[in-house]
Regions:
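Aromatic-rich carbohydrate-binding modules that target alpha-glucans
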Residues: 1-47, 53-85
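N-terminal cap/lid segment of alpha/beta-hydrolase-fold proteins
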Residues: 71-115
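Short beta-strand element of the alpha/beta-hydrolase
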Residues: 118-128
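Active-site nucleophile loop of the alpha/beta-hydrolase fold
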Residues: 127, 159, 220-229, 261
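Short amphipathic alpha-helix adjacent to the substrate-entry channel of hydrolases
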Residues: 133-153
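Primarily recognizes the serine-hydrolase "nucleophile elbow" in alpha/beta-hydrolase
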Residues: 135, 190-242, 247-250
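Alpha/beta-hydrolase active-site loop
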Residues: 167-187
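The feature captures the conserved acid-bearing segment of alpha/beta-hydrolase catalytic domains
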Residues: 229-289, 295
C-alpha cells in the first residue's frame, strides 16, 4: 500500500517485506531496511518504480498496487505517479513500419524504414528493447508522416553481452561496423547516421561518435552510463573516462541528452552537459522526474529526433 502526497510517498510494507527498493535506491544496490512505513520525498510530478525484498533478499511486487511498471527487465516493479505527473506520450503513426529480422553470423539485427527513400539512418543499441519496448520505429514513422523529420532507415542491433560489448570493446566495434556495412550493401546508402543508445548503449554510441566523428555526427544519448573507463566493470565507481576524452577532442557530435532525476547517473550527465555547454557544442539537455527506465527514455525519442533531424 502507498499513500501519495504532493512531493512524498509513504510506503506501507506487507508483512514479509524486509526492505524497499526502486529507482531511488538503484534497486538492490542500496535497499532501505523496513521496520514499518517509510516516507520518502520525490520531485513534484515524479514517476517512481519500486518493489520490496523478502527476508531472503528476493524482490517481490507490492500486492496492494495493481499498477505494473512498464519495465521489460523485471515483472515485480510497481509504479506510483505523484500529482502533476504528465507522461509525454510518443506520437503514433497512421501506418506501422515493417521490421525485418537479419543475422550476420551470430549477431541479430533488425531493419525498418520510415517513409520512402530514406535520407538518414538511425542505429540503436539494445535493438530489441528500442524496437519492442520503446517503439522507436513507430515514433520515427509518426514524425515522418507529420513532416517533422525526413524519411529514415532504422537499424536495431542486439547485443550478446551488453556489459562487455558496450564498455569500449574494439571487438564489438569492429562487428558493429560490419553490420552497418551489411545494411548498406543490402539496402543502399546509409546517408547521415544518427546513433541512439540508453545506459551502456548510450555510452557506446557516444564513444563511437568520438572515435569516428565524420561517420557519426549525431547522438541521441539517454541516461548514458558515463561512470566507465576501459577495463573497468563498476558502473558506480569507475572514473568518467569519456568526459576526459571529450574535453580533449577537437570535434564533438551534435547531442541530444536526457537523464532521470531519480538515478545515479544524474550527476555524471550534468557534468557532461556542462562540458558541452563550456565547449559550445550544439546540444540539448533535459532532465525528467523519473528514473533509469523505459518510461523515462520513451518520452525522449520524439524531441530527440526533432532536435537532431528536424529543421532548425
Amino acid at each position: 500500500v502507498v499513500r501519495v502526497s504532493k512531493r512524498t510517498v509513504t510506503f506501507f510494507p506487507p508483512a514479509q517485506a524486509r526492505a524497499l527498493i526502486g529507482d531511488f535506491t538503484d534497486w538492490e544496490r542500496n535497499p532501505i531496511p523496513l521496520q514499518g512505513p517509510v516516507t520518502l520525498e520525490f520531485p513534484e510530478g515524479a514517476y517512481v518504480e519500486y518493489a520490496f525484498l523478502d527476508e531472503r533478499g528476493r524482490p517481490f511486487p507490492d500486492p496492494e498496487n495493481p499498477e505494473r511498471a512498464d519495465n521489460p527487465w523485471w515483472t515485480y516493479p510497481r509504479a506510483v505517479r505523484l500529482p502533476g505527473h504528465r507522461f509525454e506520450a510518443p506520437p503514433q503513426p497512421r501506418e506501422e513500419p515493417k521490421v525485418e529480422r537479419h543475422r550476420l553470423g551470430e549477431r541479430r539485427f533488425y531493419v525498418a524504414e520510415a517513409g520512402t527513400s530514406p535520407k538518414a539512418t538511425l542505429v540503436a543499441q539494445d535493438g530489441v528493447a528500442f524496437y519492442r519496448t520503446a517503439g522507436l520505429h513507430r515514433v520515427a514513422q509518426a514524425l515522418v508522416e507529420a513532416g517533422e523529420i525526413p524519411p529514415v532507415r532504422l537499424v536495431f542491433v542486439e547485443p550478446m553481452d551488453r556489459n562487455q560489448e558496450y564498455r569500449f570493446s574494439e571487438a564489438y566495434e569492429e562487428e558493429f561496423h560490419r553490420v552497418l556495412g551489411e545494411v548498406e550493401r543490402s539496402k543502399g546508402p546509409l546517408g547521415e547516421i544518427l546513433l541512439v543508445g540508453a545506459s551502456l548503449g548510450g555510452l557506446f554510441s557516444l564513444w563511437q561518435a568520438l572515435r569516428h566523428p565524420n561517420r557519426f555526427p549525431k547522438v541521441l544519448a539517454l541516461s548514458p552510463a558515463l561512470k566507465a573507463h576501459p577495463g573497468g566493470t563498476d558502473a558506480y565507481r569507475d572514473r568518467e573516462w569519456l568526459l576526459e576524452r571529450c574535453a580533449e577532442a577537437q570535434v564533438l557530435p551534435r547531442i541530444y541528452l536526457e537523464v532521470g532525476l531519480l538515478e545515479w547517473l544524474l550527476a555524471p550527465a550534468r557534468r557532461f552537459a556542462a562540458l558541452l555547454a563550456d565547449r559550445k557544442v550544439p546540444h540539448a539537455y533535459r532532465e525528467r522526474a523519473s528514473g533509469h527506465n523505459w518510461v523515462t527514455w520513451k518520452q525522449a525519442l520524439a524531441p530527440g529526433l526533432r532536435y537532431l533531424l528536424g529543421e532548425a
